[in-house]
Amino acid sequence: MNRDTSPDLHYLSGFGNEFASEALPGALPVGQNSPQKAPYGLYAELLSGTAFTMARSELRRTWLYRIRPSALHPRFERLARQPLGGPLGGINPNRLRWSPQPIPAEPTDFIEGWLPMAANAAAEKPAGVSIYIYCANRSMERVFFNADGELLLVPEQGRLRIATELGVMEVEPLEIAVIPRGMKFRVELLDGQARGYIAENHGAPLRLPDLGPIGSNGLANPRDFLTPVAHYEEAEGPVQLVQKFLGEHWACELQHSPLDVVAWHGSNVPYKYDLRRFNTIGTVSFDHPDPSIFTVLTSPTSVHGMANMDFVIFPPRWMVAENTFRPPWFHRNLMNEFMGLINGAYDAKAEGFLPGGASLHGVMSAHGPDAETCEKAIAADLAPHKIDNTMAFMFETSQVLRPSLQALECPQLQADYDSCWATLPSTFNPNRR
């Protein structure tokens, strides 16, 4: 199948906007969504990301004007090669950590390379999150859409070129991409191989967190989110369309590219964001603030302040707190924390937590800085210093995350993780304050 592999990439700026884009002049109807005859002989199609009657501020929908409607496809058949999945592991309250997963030796495209790590909901439920690590070494020739949830991609190695129905975006490590539920896309590897993390959000679409007393600016600013402009493929020839439905891959063969949207308008859009543009907030007096100040995106629940999923980062930042234990404090949390590392080192773990690795601390699992970090922090000269060349992140969720059977049985699971706290001494002396 022939396709344009090098369009000029342009983006629209903003978050939650009503965007509009057309690859041909006049392709968008004026004053209505579904005219009797759409410009250029296109078909009008609505892609809904939320229910019709949601509050307008929460509504996500986009009108597509395409060469062929999505309904033009044969029957989907279950693929013989299914993604790694199956049952979650048994109940396990232990703290878990994994070394980086290897890039596969055999040819593996983006959708073949998902390793399930943890989940807290079945795909048919309108809440919860499933977490994966992806490892790939070849570009996709087929096209994919995920009926189970919204996808948040966090590259750790290798740039991705993501061709979506609405346009093309390139995403590199230290950037993230979000693809709405049901949107068709293809991932091409610009560096030959790639590895990273995926949060599959089954709940409310991701949005910016409220800023509260921070005010009207700070954290991830809306103007730094980028949505691709319209770009279409007018191609004849066989192409496989794969959908993920209730955790399984089903496919059909089309005789055209399904990435054939010539124009579109709406708010249900793919986007990318450069984590280096995050406006980090921290203390300028004492104590380590709660990690919620590092929230980039959140998927809320019906309980105010309780997240279905938060995406939190730990970026480069200045540490200036006086008379303060500066690393993240020891903690037992109502929330469940899955952490990854994009580059550098995490300031609470001196050893063992590597880029491409991961950790899971479940509800009420005691965690905090390891023994080496703790010892250094207590004795440190509290001059201002910058934590630099680092980017850790966390998928945090209010529902218990259960590790997958594959994650519990893979050789990258560190059996000795608990030992990083084993040498924490008792320094208590009742006779010396």
From Swiss-Prot:
Cofactors, names only: Fe cation
E.C. code: 1.13.11.5
Gene Ontology cellular component terms for the protein in this record: cytoplasm
Reactions this protein catalyses: homogentisate + O2 = 4-maleylacetoacetate + H(+)
Family annotation (InterPro entries): HgmA_C, HgmA_N, Homogentis_dOase, Homogentis_dOase_bac, RmlC-like_jellyroll, RmlC_Cupin_sf
Keyword terms of this UniProt record: Dioxygenase, Iron, Metal-binding, Oxidoreductase, Phenylalanine catabolism, Tyrosine catabolism
Keyword Metal-binding found: yes
One GO BP: tyrosine catabolic process
Function comment: Involved in the catabolism of homogentisate (2,5-dihydroxyphenylacetate or 2,5-OH-PhAc), a central intermediate in the degradation of phenylalanine and tyrosine. Catalyzes the oxidative ring cleavage of the aromatic ring of homogentisate to yield maleylacetoacetate.
Oligomeric form and interacting partners: Hexamer; dimer of trimers.
Protein name: Homogentisate 1,2-dioxygenase
Organism: Pseudomonas putida (strain ATCC 700007 / DSM 6899 / JCM 31910 / BCRC 17059 / LMG 24140 / F1)
